[in-house]
Amino acid sequence: MLTTMQRVHNKPIDSIGGFKHLVKQSNGGDGGVTATDMQEPSIETDKLSYEIFSILESKFLFGYDDDLKLMESRSRDPSPEQETASPAMVEALNGVVPGTVKNQRGKVCVLSIDSGGMRGIIPGKALAYLEHALKSKSGDPNARIADYFDVASGSGIGGIFTAMLFASSDGNRPIFKAEDTWRFLAMKGKSFYNKSPPGILNRVMKTGSGGSGGSGSKLEKAMKESFEELTLKDTLKPVLIPCYDLTSSAPFLFSRADALETDGYDFKLWEVCRATWAEPGVFEPVEMRSVDGKTRCVAVDGGLAMSNPTAAAITHVLHNKQEFPFVRGVEDLLVLSLGTGQLVDVKYDCDKVMKWKAKHWARPAVRISADGAADTVDQAVSMAFGQCRRSNYVRIQANGSSFGPCKPNIDTDASPSNVNMLVGVAEEMLKQKNAESVLFGGKKINEESNYEKLDWLAGELVLEHQRRSCRIAPTVAFKQSGDRRVDQQTIFKDIDCMF
């Protein structure tokens, strides 16, 4: 080992300051080493070897010149005063001490938003509160969700919220605030859902849901007004927005990482949003092509493919070593998953349900399936995090409400009364105790409320953001044009393995 280090430093061993002196001290002063010493190294010899290697390592990596002083500082145990940074240093870096974080890998921050139609008001209110908490804890009145999350995934209405929060017209700041998400749905939802759809299939779906149809043209107009000619490349951070492709009979992920590699995977954002919210029986399917016209997709609701896209986002990070080179496992992630509410108080009249035919079960079956799938993903992700789930994974979900039974068409009812009820459910949800999935233990009610959990998360996000300026290596290295694409089939394969 020493011979190798000699070659690295290009100088003889005895020219390294203090080395001869150390050898003489450890061997009685004459510098001689007996055969017994070679065969049975003492504790002092082992300690000496460690100190020598530390000196060589420090000289090679950091250029220290005073080796004896360095060795003495290493041999002393740090006092409590030495371990604590001065108040001035803490204040200068907002509580971040450079020496304490330079060797940490940091955490990749992930945001995921479920599908759920008008129930999207619930996660929208949670996003608005989180952004407010980020402004408060960072001291930055212009703080945005996109400043603190590295990856975002959203399905259905969650996909539209994701695009709103991360799309940028100038490549610097997002177009929308978090408050705009739920207000967009509350104010414009009625224009999307107030039209009775034509066609036999849509009439069947309408009959089964007991609710209204939708106007795809008005939704399309709203998306065009919001995003104009922006594409997936125009998002500030990696985004993942799913749909179900009828041409391939498989899920399809719209991905910024793919779009940066080739125009064949770059789509206009308004089309992406229209596709992920193309609920069967409510909005028409969307035939769309990539910006270069080479990739064709006939898309329907992303909620059919993955109502809870958290697993897709996590898998994307774990396999994307170009953008997230230092992630070794879920312990290096900080994940926020927002649900659209498990409203178990949906009212079904037993006598009527007993007489339902297949057409009547259409929309209720879709809703039950989507909510069940979202909960299954939550359970699987929680199991994957294991013992670190409380510090690395946060799920915010409404579990019932005090507003009484909900209508079966709560997802598509944009009436003022339903909107007001959903706003009330969202505010009540933030006050509810946070519930987490426990390995083989169902749901566990925590002592913290969802408000408190989001406050804690905001603090962690701000701290992670500050620490990154003090680290030697970057936590993230976002992809530029021409980089290798993460294969979608790999992502879907690993999602399947989680179950």
From Swiss-Prot:
One of its GO terms (biological process) is lipid catabolic process. Keywords: Hydrolase, Lipid degradation, Lipid metabolism, Plant defense. GO terms for molecular function: hydrolase activity; lipase activity; phospholipase activity. Highly expressed in siliques and at lower levels in roots and flowers. A motif (DGA/G) lies at residues 301-303. Coiled coil: none annotated. It holds the Pfam family Patatin. One of its GO terms (cellular component) is plasma membrane. A motif (GGXR) lies at residues 116-119. SUPFAM superfamilies: FabD/lysophospholipase-like. The active site is at 155 (nucleophile), 301 (proton acceptor). Its EC number is 3.1.1.-. Residues 111-314 form the PNPLA domain. Belongs to the patatin family. Possesses non-specific lipolytic acyl hydrolase (LAH) activity. Hydrolyzes phospholipids as well as galactolipids. May play a role in disease resistance. The nitrogen atoms of the two glycine residues in the GGXR motif define the oxyanion hole, and stabilize the oxyanion that forms during the nucleophilic attack by the catalytic serine during substrate cleavage. This is Patatin-like protein 6. It comes from Arabidopsis thaliana (Mouse-ear cress). The gene is PLP6.
